[in-house]
Amino acid sequence: MNHKPLTTAELAELTAGLHRLSRNLWWTWNQEPQEIFHDLSPRGWTNLYHNAVAILHEVSDYELRMRLQEPEFADRVRTVLKNFDAYLQSKDTWGAQNAPELLKNPVAYFSAEFGFHETLPIAAGGLGMLAGDHAKAASDLGLGFVGITLFYREGYFQQTVNADNWQTEYYAHLKPQNLPIEPVLNANGEPLVCTVKVATSTVSFRAWRANVGRCPVYLLDANLPENEPHQRDLTLRVYGGDTTTRVMQEILLGVGGVRLLRELGLQPSTFHMNEGHAAFLTLELAREKMAEGKAFAQAWAETKQQCLFTTHTPVEAGHDRFSSELMGFAANKFCANLKLSHQELMGLGRVNPADEREPFCMTVLALKGSRAANGVSELHGAVSREMWQCLYPGKKVDEVPIGHVTNGVHVAGWMKGTVRRFWRKKLATAHEQPDMSTTETTRFWKSKPLIDWEREINEPQFWARMADPAFISDEELWSLRYRLRRELIEFSRRRLLIQGQRLTQGDFITFDHMLNPDALTIGFARRFATYKRAPLIFQQFENIVKLAHDKQRPVQFIFAGKAHPRDDEGKRFIQHIIHLSKFSDLKGHLFFIENYDVHVARQMVSGCDVWLNNPRRPLEASGTSGMKCGSHGCLNMSIMDGWWREGYDGTNGFSIGDDTHPASIEEQDRRDSANTFKVLTEEVIPCFYNRDATGIPRQWLGKVRRAMTTLVPQFSTWRMVQEYTRKYYQPK
């Protein structure tokens, strides 16, 4: 069949559409645009680490025109652009129906880090990934939302391990022109520049805009020629530098963020602080009100009504504290602006304002400056009330005004392409061959066309179908699980080959035989903070070795994660695990994958059979990595802490221990290690290897079905953002 070539105007329209699409992070949680960018340059997709903007820079105009002249490819591009524009322009959203007032006066969400995708590595861990997922869900729901963070031009560190098995860090310079961000310009088409007073000088900053679907997230950037070198480095690295750098970063984030919003003409209804890093925004809001002639007491009371604070950790090191001397140097301008003495300013960040020895705590400032506060799980809310009761004299612990909203994950953003395509195909087949039953779930599906995939996979009714063998048989589910495990193993082999060749003369043959595609595969991947106890399971070393070497029921472990550059104890955990993987009887059964990031996480949560989580209770405020497993059929095996305490129901995974913990750290570690081994040997391994005559582990798949049904819709950021809206964003 002859197809009419595209005109110059048609080519220009599709080309412009692809460039526009590449600079909106919507493509990162939608499969079809990812496949288009991949097909434009399969090698570039790999070499440029899935960076759509960079791929369009790499592909020549001639190559792009030739691909667009292919009718099938051009049709795919048109369809994706049509869906993209329909998404952006839709007025029929949850936010429009349930919180229309926020479209005019949005929520301003401040976070020191945002994790969106591997192409924009400006997050250090779970706090940033939660912020990114929060923004994606707000976009999907059509909520009035704007994010504020910093643009770290070297991002978070890249990890390698040296010959001594010690973590080393290096930083890659991020080039804005190759990232899914765009400059914020003034009316003259020039970069919009704002200023903020830090210490004894003025810091200028510009902003970049990351389009997260419908929602903008602004990244403040101090790397301007008019700034001194140390000022430019305020936005060099995530959590980089010393405490002086940290307090200056936080002034820039909080004060600078408010000033940028005002320059943009935005009047947020709520300023949501994701951790205490941005708490200086409360002082800037009070300054604005005092500039209108109000006294500090009135200005502070009105500021509190605008602010919400989410605390994320009971770990002491997670709460920034600054000395009186440092505050006097870095934050002296606040005193003049607010007509406060230095001691009065310090009192805003102290539990006891009169205690001159007490440092200034950003969490205390955030709590004092907010109308409401919350923890990130039910247990964490209770722990936080006890932890901060000292700020509320006369109140019993259960009267402390700190609630909770349990975290979630953005299901579409974490769902691997293999699984997404599988469910799309299953749904299409189900609609072609409708079930004639009259159950509520069936009526739901017969009434909804397949036009909004993201909406469907966040509906409990979709996941309720996982319990129905008529919708998906055990054979199909087990085949999917095998494929995902196989993909993880192939990915791990490639990574291990690169790691091995850097340090030794390893060859592909050696690494191609690593990892058994039929073995029970247990994964552990997260920040190597010491309270997360990465090596805990290996306290039962001899017993674990026996399990790993069982030829009838083999077990293998894949670990990944980064320790903070200044956390030597976390680095020792990494060193210990790598040493075991190379020089102990666990060699060939234990593996460590370097440079943990979003891409590695997606491979692991999808391909592992079991997701191990053993924090020292109750220090895991929530945890979210285990939430990403459910949609892929990976089961959680976890201490009863954080989100798992709410998620586990006895049928949808495995519990290590119970809802208690001893006061002694040594006793807790000993008991948890023993319980981990007990659950592994008495529950996990027998359940996984108990096969019927056809080789299918029916009982195991029953747990997989229950996990999908009970966990995925409940622990999603769609549910989480809706809960924040009802509880905290909307005026009471």
Predicted region positions:
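Catalytic cores of carbohydrate-active enzymes across secretory and cytosolic contexts
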Residues: 1-732
